[in-house]
């Protein structure tokens, strides 16, 4: 139902590639689909890193990373969709799961956003990146556009090759 787009970019002067995985994982399932997609993603990332490539996976995980403090975005109601959690240890020591929770990356779609009381709205941090250890993470930033264009805010990652 959802997808991964894997792109390979050559790195001049090396046999390695920068592997970019753009993703949108399952949201509305009982959990088995998300778990299977996460395992498949982990396998792809680990295989690419083992081949000596630089790897970044990023997008809408429709899950939260287990290493992120989400206390600023409590579940407002049991009636609203709640994301699952990705245990970041599933990706091993060769990867970092990272996002920026200083602003929400997503909002609920249960009611119109414009003109709504933003204090009682449901927010999530379900977008982010998984980065291989041969890349230096300089920064990650959620750009708070107040959901002007989408139900997601963009998130930016700045990395350098080690």
Predicted regions mapped to residue ranges:
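Solvent-exposed loop/turn segments connecting transmembrane beta-strands
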Residues: 30-33, 147-151
């Amino acid at each position: 139902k959802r997808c991964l787009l894997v792109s390979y970019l050559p790195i001049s002067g090396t046999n390695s590639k920068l592997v970019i995985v753009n993703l949108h994982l399952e949201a509305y399932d009982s959990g088995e689909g998300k778990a299977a997609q996460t395992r498949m993603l982990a396998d792809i990332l680990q295989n690419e890193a083992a081949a000596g490539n630089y790897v970044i996976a990023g997008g809408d995980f429709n899950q939260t990373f287990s290493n992120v403090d989400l206390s600023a975005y409590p579940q407002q109601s049991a009636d609203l969709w709640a994301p699952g959690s990705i245990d970041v240890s599933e990706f091993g020591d060769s990867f970092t799961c990272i996002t920026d929770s200083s602003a929400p990356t997503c909002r609920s779609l249960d009611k119109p956003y414009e003109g709504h009381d933003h204090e009682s709205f449901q927010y999530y941090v379900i977008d982010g990146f998984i980065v291989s250890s041969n890349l230096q993470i300089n920064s990650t930033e959620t750009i708070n556009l107040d959901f002007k264009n989408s139900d997601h805010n963009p998130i930016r990652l700045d990395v350098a090759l080690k």
